[in-house]
C-alpha cells in the first residue's frame, strides 16, 4: 500500500486504490492453472470481483478489480504479435468496460501494482506510451 500513498494525494483515489489493492489478488489459489486458459470465469480476478460485490457497490471499483490484469495481457499480446492490432483491441475492450472517467484510476492501480519491486515495469511504460488521456504518475 506504500505505492498508493506515493502515487496520489487525492483522498478518494487513495481509498479506491486501497480497496482494489487489498482484494485484487487474494483468490489466485483458486484460479484454474491449465494453460492456455480454458475458462476465464475461473480467473482469480473474477473470483475477487465476485467476493468484492458483497461489500462494494461502486461498479467502477468492481471493474478495476475484475480487469486489473488486462493491461498486462494487452502488453503481452503486443510483444507476441506486434504486427497485429490484437493488443489495441484488448485495450479498447478494457476502456469500453471502464469508461473514460475511470481510465486514470485503472492506470494508477496498474502502476502501483507493477512497481512493487518484483515485476517488470515494461508493461506500464508501454501503457503510458500507448494510452491517451491519462495523467502520468511518478513513484
Regions found by a protein language model. Give the residues of each.
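Active-site glycine- and acidic-residue-rich loops that bind
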Residues: 2
Amino acid at each position: 500500500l506504500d505505492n498508493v500513498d506515493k502515487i496520489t494525494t487525492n483522498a478518494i483515489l487513495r481509498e479506491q486504490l486501497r480497496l482494489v489493492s487489498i482484494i485484487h489478488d487474494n483468490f489466485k489459489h483458486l484460479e484454474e492453472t491449465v494453460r492456455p486458459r480454458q475458462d476465464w470465469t475461473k480467473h482469480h480476478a473474477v473470483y475477487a470481483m465476485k467476493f468484492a460485490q458483497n461489500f462494494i457497490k461502486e461498479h467502477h471499483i468492481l471493474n478495476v478489480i475484475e480487469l486489473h490484469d488486462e493491461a498486462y495481457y494487452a502488453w503481452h499480446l503486443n510483444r507476441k504479435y506486434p504486427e497485429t492490432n490484437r493488443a489495441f483491441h484488448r485495450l479498447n475492450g478494457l476502456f469500453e468496460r471502464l469508461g473514460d472517467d475511470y481510465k486514470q484510476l485503472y492506470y494508477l492501480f496498474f502502476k502501483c501494482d507493477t512497481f512493487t519491486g518484483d515485476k517488470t515495469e515494461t508493461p506500464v511504460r508501454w501503457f503510458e506510451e500507448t494510452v491517451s488521456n491519462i495523467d502520468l504518475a511518478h513513484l
